[in-house]
């Protein structure tokens, strides 16, 4: 069904040949081909599109210009905007949900003029044209209740009036169910909008504050509690050296002869006194050689006293199978 055009946008066209012709038209006759072209152009301008159907009659003043529905006293209340156009409350609510923003204003769908809304009351606070309502819907607002619009949930609902004082004579009819209109148009954050900078700053501040709180709880509460309630741990004690202790040998007094820090190995007869128990540890020869040939080889060595002298002081030949002995021979 094509949408009807408002009556103020339509311009009537006088039928040809119905009225008296001007004198100029009698003196200048038109050619038949030119007259047909002008008639086709006028038809296209009047209809808005070539080949369209017949012009619909103007909308009734008791119908909404958007949904072409009759006004009533519930959700089809006639609401007047600041520009003077009248629409039903349901259509204005759907228009508000389809418009990005906080719902603080609504634009007229005909002239695009904005209308400011009350901060907390919204669309139901617009003036109502009671003269466009049918007679059965012209009840006082105190009896029929108030219509509310929840833009966040997209609901139109009727709030029932308070019960009248006095005895209850008859039950009031139940209110109509709420009308769901859909969700409002969500704002998509993009890099071009300045809102994302504020949101990012708030998120960063929240993260930093949460990190500081967690760190403070861990440092000032968890660590002291763990150290106080846990088993005693061994502590390291620094052992200081005794007073007067020195890591270096004492220096000799001046004028004393120099003595080396090491002592030479004792040689000669002092060895037995310097190393006690050496004679006990020395192994005696097990037994003499039983083979006479082997004994001769052993005796071939120099048996005079100069052999040990040439070899060095304190050196003596040692028999086979015995340990070396230090001392004078």
From Swiss-Prot:
Residues 1-55, 122-181, 248-329 are annotated as: Disordered. One of its GO terms (molecular function) is ubiquitin protein ligase activity. Residues 159-179 have a biased composition (Pro residues). InterPro entries: RING_finger_E3_ubiq-ligases, Znf-RING_euk, Znf_RING, Znf_RING/FYVE/PHD, Znf_RING_CS. One of its GO terms (biological process) is protein ubiquitination. The keyword Zinc-finger applies. Keywords: Membrane, Metal-binding, Transmembrane, Transmembrane helix, Zinc, Zinc-finger. It comes from the Eukaryota. A zinc finger (RING-type) spans 64-112. Residues 37-47, 281-293 have a biased composition (Acidic residues). The chain crosses the membrane at residues 203-223. It is a single-pass membrane protein. It is found in: Membrane. GO terms for cellular component: membrane. Residues 294-304 have a biased composition (Basic and acidic residues). Residues 14-32 have a biased composition (Low complexity). This is RING finger protein 225. The gene is RNF225.
């Amino acid at each position: 069904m094509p949408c009807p055009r408002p009556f103020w946008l339509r311009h009537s066209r006088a039928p040809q040949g119905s009225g008296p012709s001007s004198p100029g038209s009698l003196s200048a006759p038109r050619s038949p081909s030119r007259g047909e072209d002008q008639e086709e152009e006028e038809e296209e301008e009047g209809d808005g599109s070539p080949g369209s159907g017949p012009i619909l009659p103007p909308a009734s003043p008791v119908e909404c210009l958007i949904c072409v529905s009759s006004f009533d006293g519930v959700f089809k209340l006639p609401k007047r905007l600041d520009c003077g156009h009248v629409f039903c409350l349901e259509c204005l609510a759907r228009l508000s949900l389809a418009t990005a923003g906080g719902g603080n204003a609504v634009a007229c769908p005909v002239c695009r003029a904005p209308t400011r809304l009350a901060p907390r009351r919204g669309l139901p606070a617009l003036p109502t044209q009671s003269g466009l309502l049918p007679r059965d819907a012209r009840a006082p607002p105190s009896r029929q209740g108030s219509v509310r619009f929840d833009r966040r949930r997209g609901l139109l609902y009727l709030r029932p009036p308070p019960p009248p004082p006095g005895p209850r004579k008859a039950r009031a009819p139940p209110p109509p169910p709420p009308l769901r209109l859909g969700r409002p148009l969500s704002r998509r954050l993009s890099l071009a909008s300045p809102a994302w900078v504020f949101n990012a700053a708030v998120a960063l501040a929240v993260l930093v504050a949460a990190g500081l709180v967690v760190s403070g709880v861990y440092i000032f509460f968890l660590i002291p509690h763990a150290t106080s309630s846990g088993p005693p741990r061994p502590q390291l004690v620094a052992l200081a050296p005794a007073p007067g202790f020195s890591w270096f040998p004492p220096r000799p007094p001046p004028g004393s002869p120099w003595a080396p820090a090491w002592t030479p190995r004792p040689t000669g007869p002092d060895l037995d006194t310097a190393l006690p128990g050496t004679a006990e540890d020395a192994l005696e020869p097990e037994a003499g050689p039983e083979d006479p040939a082997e004994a001769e080889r052993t005796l071939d060595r120099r048996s005079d006293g100069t052999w040990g002298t040439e070899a060095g002081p304190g050196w003596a030949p040692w028999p086979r199978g015995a340990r070396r002995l230090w001392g004078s021979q």
